[in-house]
Every structure is written in structure tokens, then in C-alpha cells.
Amino acid sequence: MSDDYRETDPTRQPEDMGEGSLRPETLADFTGQKASRENLAIFIEAARARNEALDHVLLHGPPGLGKTTLAQIVARELGVGFRATSGPVIQRAGDLAAILTNLQPRDVLFIDEIHRLQPAIEEVLYPAMEDFQLDLIIGEGPAARSVRIDLAPFTLVAATTRAGLLATPLRDRFGIPLRLVFYTPEELRAIVSRGALKLGMRLTDDGAEEIARRSRGTPRIAGRLLRRVRDFALVSKHAVVDRALADAALGRLEVDERGLDAMDRRYLKRIAEHHHGGPVGVETLAAGLAEARDTLEDVIEPYLIQEGLVLRTARGRMLGEAGWRHLGLTPPASQVDLLSSLEQDDSAP
């Protein structure tokens, strides 16, 4: 079994042991995702009142929005053990069986990237999730026999950026599906301000606002930018980080006012300059940018589409009006007509 499987005490996670994690540790400390957070609090309280394992939870949405953090918080709030692994490292049914049989009653098992589980391993997971039982084949050929193993009741918390890739039988076994969405600038400003306190930084309100505004609606990016701005402040001997210093540091990092980095701008320019604004297939874009298709779909595109900079159509990707404006370019007449026709299609009943 892979060494990437981890057992942890929910009150002391590996991320807490360094310089000071920026992760919140309780639902009360968790900023954003209001509806999902409030519903999860109710489900956790109900499970504790019944002294039962919480129903299985599926967390899906773009990367960096707090899926792993929420999984850890669920274990803390329930007061149970937390076990973590990921889909790609579970190579055999025996690996999964070893993990499941070592769980204590009501423990939380976190599987990241669950969409990358092999189909044969998914089949083993079905009875484990539904009946807390494992059906394993022991031996080979005529001597093979089926063995059923009873498991302690547990909660599977799974995370994925590609919920559509999950097999329907697997997806349907999650009683609590929660979609995480991009954070508002106000939520990110609160996250950045709290992170600055944990890092011992003196950060002005407008400095926090500047970092939040360029964080693409994503706490993970906000935390990364906050740490890099701190580095610039330290080396330049600034005791206080204000908007001007944050702006200068983020400019050095090539993060523009909308939070787009050099790769995002390459993506937009590729569509504009090489494909006349699109539509263009994602495979063609991936080849032209020398990036994996998954990188475009999971990392680059979600925020660009959310902001209207890019449109995803049946014929491929197109630059939206906001994308042309961001590049400081004027769309050709053919693109203006095409964008107008798409708007009319969207407004049709």
C-alpha cells in the first residue's frame, strides 16, 4: 500500500505543525461557503446526537476552495479519527481493504481525487459505503472463494474537481453532496486578514483588499500570495504591508488586477491571436500551450469562465467580451456577430 496513506489525530493535523497554518480548524472559523457550511453543521450535530457515523460526504468544485480543510474539520467536529489518502495511490483492492479494516467506529476516511479511482476499486467501495461490508475474492482459479468482512461504521468524505467523471452508482451513495463555489472579495479579505494575524504580519485593510481582489476567488491562492507579499515586505524592510506594497509585490509576481497570471494571459492570447477568438477545441489549445488538457480544465478555465473572460460552447472555447477587453484588443466583426448570436440563444426561452 502507498506511503501516501496517512493517519492523523483530528486535533493535530500535519498542516498545523509548521510555521502556522492558515487553515481554519472549526466550522465557526471557516469563512465562506455559507449554505454548505451551515448545512454541514446541522448534519454533524444530528450525527453526534444519534451517536452514529455521519453520512458520506462528497465535496466537489474547483481546486483550492477548501475541500481538504472541510474534511479535516468534519473529523474535528465529530471528535473522531481522520484518515487520508487519494484516488491515484490506491492501486489494488487490497490497498483499500487495508485502509477500511483499520478504521475505528465513526472515523472519517478522506479520499482526494476520488474520480481517479480505478473502476474495479470503486466496485469494492460500494458495499463498504452502503452496508459497511467488504466483499473480497481470496485466491485464484478454482480455489478462489468470496469472503465478506464486516467494517466499523465510518464516514467517507471524498473530494473531486470533476464530479461528472464519477460513476453514477458511486455518486449516488453520497448522502451529503456539497458543491463549493468561488469566494467573494469580502470573504477573501477576511481570510487574508486572519492569515496575516497568524503569520505575524501587519497588514492594512486596503492591503488585505488588494491581495483578496487578485486571488481569483480562491483561498489557496490568497494564502500563497499573502506569503509572497510577506517575503517582499521582509526583504524591502517594510514593517507594514499596505495597498501600494501589495500592488508592487503582486506586480513582480505577474499577477494582474483581476488575479490573472502569466499562464492565464497566455491562454487568452492564444485564443485571440492564433484562433481569432475561437471557437477552438480544448485539445488544440492544450497542444498549442504545451499543457495537459486536465490542467486547462481544472486549473485555468474555471475562473476565466466564471468571470466571463472565456465562453465554453458546443464548438469549443471562445473569448468573451470581457476577455477581449482584458487583453486591450478589439474583437473582429465576425466575433462580435458570433457573441451577439450566443447572447440571443442564451436569452431565448
UniProtKB/Swiss-Prot annotation:
Positions annotated to bind Mg(2+): T68
Function: The RuvA-RuvB-RuvC complex processes Holliday junction (HJ) DNA during genetic recombination and DNA repair, while the RuvA-RuvB complex plays an important role in the rescue of blocked DNA replication forks via replication fork reversal (RFR). RuvA specifically binds to HJ cruciform DNA, conferring on it an open structure. The RuvB hexamer acts as an ATP-dependent pump, pulling dsDNA into and through the RuvAB complex. RuvB forms 2 homohexamers on either side of HJ DNA bound by 1 or 2 RuvA tetramers; 4 subunits per hexamer contact DNA at a time.
Span list, region Head domain (RuvB-H): 257-349
Catalytic reaction annotation: ATP + H2O = ADP + phosphate + H(+)
Pfam families: AAA_lid_4, RuvB_C, RuvB_N
Family per record: Belongs to the RuvB family.
SMART domains assigned: AAA
GO BP, one annotated term: DNA recombination
GO cellular component: cytoplasm; Holliday junction resolvase complex
Domain of life where this protein originates: Bacteria
Annotated source species: Gluconobacter oxydans (strain 621H) (Gluconobacter suboxydans)
Descriptive protein name: Holliday junction branch migration complex subunit RuvB
Basic and acidic residues composition-biased segments: 1-15
Top-level enzyme category: hydrolase
Region (Large ATPase domain (RuvB-L)): 1-183
Subcellular locations according to the entry: Cytoplasm
The EC number(s) this enzyme carries: 3.6.4.-
Xref: InterPro entries: AAA+_ATPase, AAA_lid_4, DNA_helicase_Holl-junc_RuvB, P-loop_NTPase, RuvB-like_N, RuvB_C, WH-like_DNA-bd_sf, WH_DNA-bd_sf
Originating gene: ruvB
Subunit description: Homohexamer. Forms an RuvA(8)-RuvB(12)-Holliday junction (HJ) complex. HJ DNA is sandwiched between 2 RuvA tetramers; dsDNA enters through RuvA and exits via RuvB. An RuvB hexamer assembles on each DNA strand where it exits the tetramer. Each RuvB hexamer is contacted by two RuvA subunits (via domain III) on 2 adjacent RuvB subunits; this complex drives branch migration. In the full resolvosome a probable DNA-RuvA(4)-RuvB(12)-RuvC(2) complex forms which resolves the HJ.
Small ATPAse domain (RuvB-S), as annotated region: 184-254
